[in-house]
C-alpha cells in the first residue's frame, strides 16, 4: 500500500490495517470509497469505473466509489462472490469536527454474517459455523446472526465434513493448524473458509468469553459440561461475531448443545434424492414454492420464522416418540377445528419476521420502517393468543403459556414511531407528532413558516401604514422586509437597511433575524433530535430481546403446526401411529409431491400398500418396467416415514411405523466430475456408506444398484448387497431392480420377499397400472418404454428382433444357485454364454468321422465366429 501524505489517507491506511483481509468501504460524504488494491478488485467485480486520486501530483491512487444510499446492493454482490467487506463510517458530525472527521469500522460483512435481504432468503437460515477439536473429539457450532439461533454438537473427526454439508453453512471458522478436512472431504462443500488464531478456540478463553457475554457462572446449564471441543467452537463463533458486528449481540440465544442421536439422520444424498428441499432438476423450476419438492407441498406457513422451523424439522426429523406424539396431537386438534385454524392463520399473516427484525434492532442496523414493523407485529400477538386459549392438546397449551403478549414493548415502539416513517432516518418524519414537545415546536417552526411570515407582514403593514410592504426570503440575504422608494421615509427606526435596489429598499429587524436563525437551525435540530429519540427507542426495544426471541419461537411453532394441519385437511392426510413391534405397515400410501402434480394435471394418483418387519419381510425386491412406478413407490415409503417423525400427518389411509434412526437412499446415478468419479464409482461409494453405517433401526431404499457396470458384474454386486443387508445389517429395505435373477433370493433367504409393479398388455402395447403387488416380473418392457419415448419405428422393430434372438440363445445369467459349505450367503456360479448357433454346430459334429485337418479347420472357423460375436 502506498504511503500517502495527506491526513485523510493516513487515516485510511490506519483503518485498513485493522482489516487486511476485507475490502474496506470508506465513507466520504455521500459515497463509500475504496482505494488501492481494494479499488481495483471492487471495480472489476462490481463493473464500476476505476479512477485515481492525486493524478496531477504523480502519485496516483486507484479509487472507486458507490453512493452510500445504494451501498447495500453493492455489498451484497461482493458477499455473493465470497469477499468480506468492512464498512467504515463517519462517527461524528462533519460540521462539528475541528479537523478531520472521525471514522471507525462499524461492521464487517462476511458470507456467514450477512443479513441483507438480497443475500438471505426469508425462509432459509444463513449459518456461520466453527469447527473445534479437543483430544479425539471434534465439534461443530453454528449460529444464524439474522435470527439468533446458536447451537453446538460434538462428533468424531471423520464426521465433520458430512455435518458441515448437511448444515449448509456459508462460512466456516477453523483454527489455523487444524487439518480436519482433506481435499477429498472438502471438494463437495461450498463455504468460505476463515482461519482464526489457535488461541481463539482454547477452552479457557472460549469458556470465559461465553460466560461473560451471557452472564453465566457456568456453561453446564447449556449442556456443555465436560465438552471442551464444543466450548471451543462456540467461543470462536462469539469472538468472531464481536469482531465483525461491533454490536451488543443481545439477540443471540445461549449456545445450546444438541445430540445428533436425537434426530433421524438424513445425509445430503438422501435429502437430494428424496427432493426434500430442492428438485433434482432445479433448472426446470421457478421460485421455491413453485418447485416440486416436499417442502413446497408442506410449507403453508405464514411467517418467515415458521418457514425456517419447518425446513429444519424436515431436515432433522425427531426420534423422540413422546415429542412426536405431542406434535401430532396439536396438528390433529387444529386439523379438526376448521374455524379456529382459519382464525389462527389470519392472525399469523399479520406477523412479520420477528427474529430478523429483532436481530436488526439489537445490532443497530434497523431503520425506522424495521422498528415500526416490529412494533406492529408485536401488537398482533395478544389477539393471536386469545384465539387458542381453550385448547386441549398439551403442545398447544404449552405454546399458549410461552407466548408473551409483549404489549408494553409494542406500545413503546408505536407511541414513538410515526405511522408512515421514511425509509432512511435522515429524510425526517420518523417520530410521531405529540411524542416530544421540543420536536413538535421545531417542526411547527419549520413547517408553518409561511403562516408566521404572513402574520409579521400583516402586523408591519399596520404598524407602518405601508400597504405594499412585503416580507420575503432568498438564499443570499435570508428574510427581509421590502419597501418601495416612495415609502422609505415611513420605515421605523428599528428597521436595519440590508440592501438598496433601484426601486426599493430592503430591511431586517431583530425579530426577523431571530426567526431566520430559528428556521435555519430547525431542520438540523429536528434531524438530530429524531436520531436521538429513534436510537433511544431502538435500544429500549432491544433490551427486551430475550422476551421477543421466546415469543418468536412460540409463534414459529404455532405457524408450523397450523400449516401441517392445513395441509392434512386439504390433502386427506391421516395421523400415523408408532409401535415397538418393528413393523412398517402403510395402507394406500401416496407420494405427497407426485400426488399434487397428478391432481394439477387432472389425473389420479394410484396408492399402494407396504408391509415390512424385522423377520419374514425384512427386504422387498421390487421388479417391473421402467415408468411403472417403482421409484415413486420407494420414495413415498421413505417420505411417509420422514413426515411422521416431523410430527405431520401422512398421505396414506393408515400408517403404523417404527421410529427410524436413519434413512438411506441410493437412487439414480450421475457422474461427479469434480471429484474424478464415474457414475459407477459414485454408486458404489454411496452403497458403501449405507452398508457400513446402517443399523437394524434404519430404512434403506436402493434403486438399480449395479446398473452402472457390465451386466454380470452388476448382478453379482446387487446379489451380494442383498445378502449382506439380510445377513448382517438387518435394516428394513426396499430394493428395486431390473435383474430378475435377484427374485430367486426370496426362495433362499427367509426375510426376502418379491414385489412387482403390474402392467396390462394389449397387443404390442402396455398399460402401466402402477400397482405394487406380491410376485415377480418376468419382463422389463424396455422396448415399449422406448416406443413411448418416440424412438423411430425402425429402431423399435430391430430391437424386438434382437431381443427375440437374445432370449432364444442366452443361458440363464444367474447359473446354478448353491449354498456355501458353511451355509453362508448364496453364491452365483456364472460363465460366459455360448451362442446358440455355435453350440448346435458343435453338437452336430461326428467326432469319429472327423479327420485331423478338418478338425483344425472347424476349430479355426468356430474361433473366428466367437471373436466376431
Curated annotation (Swiss-Prot):
Coiled coil: none annotated. GO terms for biological process: mismatch repair. GO terms for cellular component: cytosol. ATP binds at residues 624-631. Keywords: ATP-binding, DNA damage, DNA repair, DNA-binding, Nucleotide-binding. One of its GO terms (molecular function) is ATP binding. Belongs to the DNA mismatch repair MutS family. This is DNA mismatch repair protein MutS. It comes from Solibacter usitatus (strain Ellin6076).
